[in-house]
Amino acid sequence: MAFKDLRPQAPVHLLVVPKKHIPTMNDLMPEDNALIGHMLQVAKTLAKQSNIHQKGYRTVFNVNAGAGQSVYHIHMHLLGGRMFSWPPG
């Protein structure tokens, strides 16, 4: 499933969320590899549908509080529509 972030950090800020409950990336098991691969394919499709696939976009998993995770059900952020810098803030 995918939907718009409630507090967008970019013109395009979508969340890709699996149905299976996995609290953090640290809880992934080898059998979840296909699920993560599917999430990346969904992000690629959404980037194209959002017309950000050519200029560039960022995908992010935040893991635990120190990295900014506030919802303990893994989800991938898809951000685009503006320039990003490195390192992130």
Question: Model-found features: residue ranges?
Answer:
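HIT superfamily nucleotide-processing domains
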Residues: 1-89
